[in-house]
Amino acid sequence: MALYETILIARQDITASQVEGLTETFTGILKENGGEVKKVEQWGLKTLTYRIKKNRKAHYVYIGHEAPAAAVAEMERNMSINEDVLRFMTVKVEKIEEGQTAMLTNKGERSERGPRGGFGDRGPRRDFGDRGPRRDFGDRGPRRDGDGPRAEGGRNEGEGDRA
């Protein structure tokens, strides 16, 4: 038997107990067909990157299991039939990691680091008065505003009196 990791995404409008019921249903299918569930994690309600079937949030569930291919196929068939499951993905792995997955580990580290900042903590804006005077490389005509070194008379060459 091979080792697999399955992630399923369930609709946002079902309760946490219903998500647990879904998880028990799918792990039961694996056990009935000769598989063994190694690890189950509820990652909770998370915001989706894009809408899936009109849902902006979804419940994520991780299942690490060892099962024959027929058991995995039967579980995936039941997931595709179930209307509460938005998406699922099963991947064959070499080993199932002990302890928490990265999704749960990062959640704890993030809160220990403190606030990550944003646009509100940048401080006052500089006034851009530190640039100095405009430079003249000699490859352009005179400037119209009076602060350039070649601005004389306020008009460009070739601009005469127009009638």
From Swiss-Prot:
GO terms for cellular component: cytosolic small ribosomal subunit. It holds the Pfam family Ribosomal_S6. GO terms for biological process: translation. CDD domains: bS6. Keywords: Ribonucleoprotein, Ribosomal protein, RNA-binding, rRNA-binding. Residues 97-163 are annotated as: Disordered. HAMAP family: Ribosomal_bS6. PANTHER family: MITOCHONDRIAL 28S RIBOSOMAL PROTEIN S6, SMALL RIBOSOMAL SUBUNIT PROTEIN BS6M. Belongs to the bacterial ribosomal protein bS6 family. Binds together with bS18 to 16S ribosomal RNA. This is Small ribosomal subunit protein bS6. The gene is rpsF.
